[in-house]
Amino acid sequence: MVVTNKYVLKWVEEMAALTKPDKIVWLDGSLEEKKKLEDECVASGEMIELNQDILPGCFYHRTAANDVARVEDRTFICSKTKEEAGPTNNWMDPAEMYAKLTPLFDGSMKGRTMYVLPYIMGPAGSPLSKVGVELTDSRYVVLNMRIMTRMGDIAWKQLGDDSEFVKGLHSKADIDADKRYIAHFPQDYTIWSINSGYGGNVILAKKCFALRIASVLAKEQDWMAEHMLILGIENEATGKTQYVTGAFPSACGKTNLAMLIPPAYAKGYKVFTVGDDIAWMRPFPDGHLYAINPENGFFGVAPGTSMESNPNALLTTKSNTIFTNVALTDDKNVWWKGMGVPAPAHMIDWLGKEWNKGDDEKAAAHPNSRFTAPASQCPSISPEWENPQGVPVSAILFGGRRAKTAPLVYQSFDWNHGVFVGATMASETTAAAAGAVGVVRRDPMAMKPFIGYNAGDYFAHWLHMGTLIEKKPLIFNVNWFKTDAEGKFMWPGYGDNFRVLEWVLKRCNNEVDARKTPIGYVPYAKDIDLTGLEGYTEADIENLLTIEKDVWEEEIAGIEKHFAGFDRLPAELENQLQAMKDRFAAV
């Protein structure tokens, strides 16, 4: 289709004049185009075609050894003032950043093709969806974006003649880590990324647009862009499906929870995946908060993904998937540690070097190696995942990895208290052998690296949203990672986390009472269903639900220190902290 949008044409012309590509290709999203790009990638060595008998439509890619993860120290929010970026972001004046990056982009696409990639975040035609255009000199980026977004002519049709689209400019340049920048210009709805070829830095639709820029749009337009999974739980007995969103820092089992398979006792229940990473949420006239998954695929961490830990994720990757920085077997299959399959005698590791049995298995695939897979292939994908209105949210979960502090689950007293629970979220590193508690890392709403503006204003926006949502979701905190005196996990986790979700929904439906404590409402042990869970008694659940005053006094001190780091902390959060102190003082 011929693009006539004058704003797009002018911007592409300006960026091409800067980057000087040999040619410009306007992408249409067709299968023929995909095949041509794949063939070119294989011919150039950018990608390796995997064994099509085992993994049809799958390809393998290695990034540069210095380019394997998001780089928070090279990621900038270039708002007009430093105060607008706030304490959680690196800031540079927008004029200064444009001046710094313009020479780096000058001629960066010489000898290459510039691909013009239009895409939609969210289901086509949804009142919640947004259009972006990414210009890139990387075919690998194009093929990833084909999976992660709804791209091509469908996006041009949705954009029409509108000027409101998010502009993304990406060039691999020469993958120089010292000149690597991922810069966001919220007032221009623009992202510039240079000298990286790694997923999170270059698939600009993902964290850059769907969280950092979208969080700014959400504040301006009274909606929410959150780092959250969305799952649906269907109760066949009632015919009712209820939806839960959840924010978890990394290494807390977010994708596993999004794709959970209920334990055998829970006959008549089904869990559906709407999204595994990002939720865009908006109040609708019926009073409910509705959520969409703006993405079209999963960009998942490969190591540890197995038929035991997350069968739905592994099955999603069996076709039409791009694997990045995993190990490559001699029969052109993929391998990583924790896959549940023994390592073969010989492989090529993620660096392209020989790997032989006896070598370190953890080193075969990079710890942050990835799969990019279409969400539509997920066995647990929700029938509602492309509903343009989204799904109504009954509950919001916050969670982290806490050895001693947080009980298995508790419910906030109300919305504002729930915002306090999310704002004080933390995860800790544990030395498993000694059970020693390590460093506590605060990660508010699991959004610390992704809030596109001042974090204090972000908390204020959460509080403001509470005034707009008539039928507010209940807010809970979960902790699958409580440990005993020996440092062993006290809860089995994985599919058994459904037992906690079941209690959460019973609270949403007003079907069960709870015990009021200084931190919130905690279950009665008898209300967590232990059917079929061998070796667990009500007494074990009691231990998982204990709240130790001395441990929480330490936690309160940690929260005070955390809050001291914000320049625009809403007074309501200080009030919530004081109220919690008062409740503990009364115990």
Question: What is the predicted function of each stretch?
Answer:
Residues 1-252, 262-587:
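Conserved internal helical-beta-strand scaffold that buttresses enzyme catalytic cores
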Residues 257:
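Hydrophobic positions on the alpha1 helix immediately C-terminal to the Walker A/P-loop
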